[in-house]
Amino acid sequence: MRILADENIPLVHAFFSAFGEIRQLPGRAIVSGSLGDADVLLVRSVTRVDAALLEGSRVRFVGTCTIGTDHLDLDYLRRRGIAWASAPGCNARGVVDYVLGSLLSLAERQGVDLASRCYGVVGAGQVGGRLVEVLRGLGWRVLVCDPPRQALERGDFVDLPTLLRECDVLSVHTPLTHEGAHPTRHLFGREQLARLRPGTWLINASRGAVVDNRALREALAGRTDLQAVLDVWEGEPLVDVALAGLCHIATPHIAGYSLDGKLRGTAQVYRAFCEQQGVPPGVLLDELLPPPWLGELGLDGRADPAWALATLCRAVYDPRRDDADFRRSLEGDEQARRSAFDALRKHYPPRREIDGLRVRLSGEAPRLRQLVRALGAEPV
């Protein structure tokens, strides 16, 4: 069996070498002519998998080590009888850490109490659902908009106009869809952006085209009260430099790039492939994942909860570092910016998730204990 894999998928050899020969290429270099005699194709979101890529190939299994599948032509794969798998939820915790870090940065800049804001989460799947749990666990008011889920289940959902009217913060976590009852391409277009409340913060860590980038650039240029955090962009790896300059935080599609999330993605696709092959998994993620290096952090039980929240989150991750690196990369010409976008992702430094943090609290500290648990850390 021959396996072709994106070179940025971690631990490919550890998980898949027992199945055969592995060849690796940059994700954007995986094209029809590079498939050779591959039976298995392992990709990330930068590789479009469709008839143009696979027609006439030997590929019988496609695995994407990402939560999204908008880069896969699933109808084509089904028609051809090609098995496929993705990694839903693999990086959910990392994205939540990114959103929390962004909120802290915005609050610090504007002198806002995060507990006083109303949060709107658009898309309550693996990532959005996890974010809702954390925000509500912190005791904050959260409204959720997810029309597909609302159509299938009872729940406390609201429509998008209600979110635009009620919420001070909007965090977008939908897949990118172009068809169906609830397409998400340009879900936030000129009309929706014009209806944002004064002082709204808009965070997009889903897919670039869910927000109309041109319309957002115009909105930010015309309304200085709005703030945007963008991790995803239309036209990646080439981004709108003017739009990035108007954002409070701008990053190169790394919100979910925690080490844990990336390894989890490979492991999920590996397990799906083992199931497709009818063999039990022989490799376990726990055997390969390095122990948490965050260690233990001590907090005075009398500490202010807002200060404690910032301290804990920033002990794990602060997106402002990635923002600074990304802005430096936008100074070159078009080709240099394209290359820099991919290079920042390829050479992204290891980052762990807050789940691995242990927090030692002095005294009873019931409020801080609840805060620590809400974040997903372990109070001791």
From Swiss-Prot:
Pathway: Cofactor biosynthesis; pyridoxine 5'-phosphate biosynthesis; pyridoxine 5'-phosphate from D-erythrose 4-phosphate: step 2/5. InterPro entries: D-isomer_2_OHA_DH_cat_dom, D-isomer_DH_CS, D-isomer_DH_NAD-bd, Erythronate-4-P_DHase, Erythronate-4-P_DHase_dimer, NAD(P)-bd_dom_sf, PdxB_dimer_sf. CDD domains: ErythrP_dh. It is found in: Cytoplasm. PROSITE patterns: D_2_HYDROXYACID_DH_3 (PS00671). One of its GO terms (molecular function) is protein dimerization activity. Catalyzes the oxidation of erythronate-4-phosphate to 3-hydroxy-2-oxo-4-phosphonooxybutanoate. This is Erythronate-4-phosphate dehydrogenase. It catalyses: 4-phospho-D-erythronate + NAD(+) = (R)-3-hydroxy-2-oxo-4-phosphooxybutanoate + NADH + H(+). Substrate binds at residues 45, 66, 257. GO terms for cellular component: cytosol. The gene is pdxB. Its main location: cytoplasm. The active site is at 207, 236, 253 (proton donor). It comes from Azotobacter vinelandii (strain DJ / ATCC BAA-1303). Signal peptide: none annotated. Belongs to the D-isomer specific 2-hydroxyacid dehydrogenase family. PdxB subfamily. Transmembrane segments: none annotated. Homodimer. PANTHER family: FORMATE DEHYDROGENASE 1. Its EC number is 1.1.1.290. GO terms for biological process: 'de novo' pyridoxal 5'-phosphate biosynthetic process; pyridoxine biosynthetic process.
